[in-house]
Design a protein with these regions (language model features):
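A generic structural signal for well-ordered alpha-helical segments enriched in polar/charged residues
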Residues: 19, 69, 73, 77, ...
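Bacterial Sec-dependent signal peptides at the C-terminal "C-region" and cleavage site
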Residues: 32-41
Length: 215
């Protein structure tokens, strides 16, 4: 699923995401329900504020870390042949999808942290990330022949920059609304939660491909 910036209407988006949003908002609101926003334990399976971040951003970071751990654990034993495996000539490889996750996050960085319009990428970023972002035939031809560490390094490089940038922002920024986003009025929290949800979508695809990969 390649839904970086969906072009469907806000009504359709809300209809499709209502159940997920209900569960997500219950998690997001946890830090605000009590009198304190004390950082929770620095444990992977504890969602909540984190030391070094504002309360809401820390909660987002804990969700980002949890989902990334799921992805990395799932692919931890894959060899190059498995990363390059195609179910059919229209499919995407696991390797390409890992690069796609890194590309998506990089483009959200540029938009969110640099204040650029979607698609207003530098030549350097376009050259490095556009093929992975688009997937499809170009990615099938270009993204192959790499070992797992190549993809983990790309994911780690991008994520490190995201976390450093988020440390310099506060909850007011996270809750600020972009009235010109294609989905309709959308805050930075929703955009970055989409990065998490996007990884979850592709995690299912990766799991399916791995179940069909010759042993």
């Amino acid at each position: 699923m390649n839904t970086i910036v969906p072009d469907y209407s806000r009504r359709d988006f809300l209809k499709k995401s209502s159940f997920a949003a209900a569960g997500t908002l219950s998690l997001v609101s946890l830090p605000l329900m009590g009198a304190s926003c004390t950082p929770v334990q620095d444990e992977l399976n504890i969602i909540g504020p984190k030391t070094g971040y504002s309360p809401q951003i820390g909660t987002l970071v804990s969700m980002m870390n949890w989902m990334r751990n799921v992805i990395e654990n799932q692919v931890s034993d894959l060899q190059q042949e498995q990363l390059d495996f195609l179910i059919d000539d229209k499919a995407n490889t696991v390797g390409a999808m890992l690069m796609h996750l890194a590309a998506t996050e990089r483009f959200y960085q540029i938009h969110s942290f640099e204040g650029k319009n979607w698609g207003d990428w530098s030549l350097e970023d376009s050259k490095r990330w556009s093929v992975a972002s688009g997937l499809g035939d170009k990615a099938r031809k270009k993204i192959k022949g790499n070992d797992l560490q190549y993809y983990l390094d790309a994911l780690g490089e991008v994520r490190s920059h995201t976390l450093n940038e988020l440390k310099n922002r506060d909850d007011e920024w996270l809750l600020s609304v972009d009235n010109n986003w294609p989905w309709g009025p959308t805050n930075a929290y929703c955009k970055w939660f989409h990065v998490v949800e996007h990884e979850s979508n592709h995690n299912g695809q990766i799991k399916f491909i791995m179940s069909r990969t010759p042993s």
